[in-house]
Amino acid sequence: MKAAVCREFGKPLVIEEVTLADAGPGEVKVKLSAVAICHSDISYADGAWGGTLPAVYGHECAGVVETVGSGVTTVKVGDHVVVTLIRSCGHCHGCSMGNPVTCSTQFPLDAASPIKDKDGKSVVQSMRTGGFAEKVLVHESQCVTVPKNIKMASASLLACGVITGFGAVTNTAKVPAGSHVVVIGTGGVGLNSIQGAHVSGARTVIAIDVVDSKIEAAKSFGATHGINSKTEDVAARVLEITGG
């Protein structure tokens, strides 16, 4: 298969022929239809976050299940899925406490990358996904089925930006209905934090940014008010909007 491989930080990714291992026990091979670009991928490729090379970045993926390994029960061949970077066993302390991101289980895919270059040398599967490729091999816990009528390009966004912003409000902050919520920055994560606050029943959702068009866009995600921090006194406006 083809993959976009980072051979040198700060340089263009190189399209190469690579091989992907077969699905082992509990693993799923997904033929990708769409991969979003997260700023984390850019930071890695630029070398800002370091890391080992060569590597295949990309971790916001959506596609169709091509093959499954033994013991896989949550997805089947032909399913449309979103692929996330979180692997979890579902049984350790972290998982049992409802925090799969802290899963302590070591998976075979953590020990050895399933990606090899044309010379048979290992290529890092970045962020447990390696999504800038035609296919990925992941643990079944990383796959979430979605309806087949959802566009894959839209579904891929669910894999990181949406769950990061939405989950920060609903799972971490646990914002109760009737709250006042302020979200600083209306990028991908910020917009989904706004959406999470709206769905949670927040009475006031204030979007703060320096670009008026982004503030207006935030209102379509549930923001009730917008503040441009370049032209307005943020603290004073928040106090005014919320009644102190």
Task: Show the residue positions of the predicted features.
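Nucleotide donor/acceptor-binding cores
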Residues: M1, D79, G178-S179, R203
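Short beta->alpha connector loops at strand-helix junctions that form conserved
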Residues: A21, L85, T105-Q106, P147, ...
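Glycine-rich beta-strand-centered segment in the early N-terminal region that forms part
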Residues: A21-V35, D46-S96, V101, T145-N149
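Structural signature of beta-strand start/N-cap positions in the alpha/beta core
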Residues: G71-T74, H180, R203-T204
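Well-ordered beta-strand positions
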Residues: H80, E134-K135, T204, H225
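NAD(P)H dinucleotide-binding glycine-rich loop of Rossmann-like/cofactor-binding domains
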Residues: H91-I184
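Adenosine-nucleotide cofactor-binding segment
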Residues: V183-T186, G196-G244
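N-terminal Rossmann-fold NAD(P) dinucleotide-binding loop
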Residues: G190-L191
